Amino acid sequence: MAKVPSRSPRKRVRKQVADGMAHIHASFNNTIVTITDRQGNALSWATSGGSGFRGSRKSTPFAAQVAAERAGIAAQDYGLKNLEVFVKGPGPGRESAIRALNAVGYKITNITDVTPIPHNGCRPPKKRRV
């Protein structure tokens, strides 16, 4: 029988990226933080729900902070130093997610609000009666 050459397990070399973008989608129910390179390829992501918060606790600023910290720490393997932040949505996790990324050690170059605003498009949902 022919002997199969054994392949030694090689550690995958991660590409080094100096500048990146952080996309924060803050809805009323959840917060999604995605860190990408300049071309938009995702390096890491985290959500409030995936960080262990369920139900109404998903939509808190603290849950958004934890999600942003997790995404930021995971993206540090790529050598990121500077982040450009894009915030979308009206949720309660907008501010705290940006502060958490700053606390992880990233230099935030600029913050842009990319919340989609309709030019009188679809009819909005009716008001809640509690």
UniProtKB/Swiss-Prot annotation:
NCBIfam families: PRK05309.1 (NF003698), uS11_bact (TIGR03632). Pfam families: Ribosomal_S11. The gene is rpsK. Belongs to the universal ribosomal protein uS11 family. GO terms for cellular component: ribonucleoprotein complex; ribosome. This is Small ribosomal subunit protein uS11. Located on the platform of the 30S subunit, it bridges several disparate RNA helices of the 16S rRNA. Forms part of the Shine-Dalgarno cleft in the 70S ribosome. Keywords: Ribonucleoprotein, Ribosomal protein, RNA-binding, rRNA-binding. Part of the 30S ribosomal subunit. Interacts with proteins S7 and S18. Binds to IF-3. It comes from Shewanella denitrificans (strain OS217 / ATCC BAA-1090 / DSM 15013). One of its GO terms (biological process) is translation. One of its GO terms (molecular function) is structural constituent of ribosome.
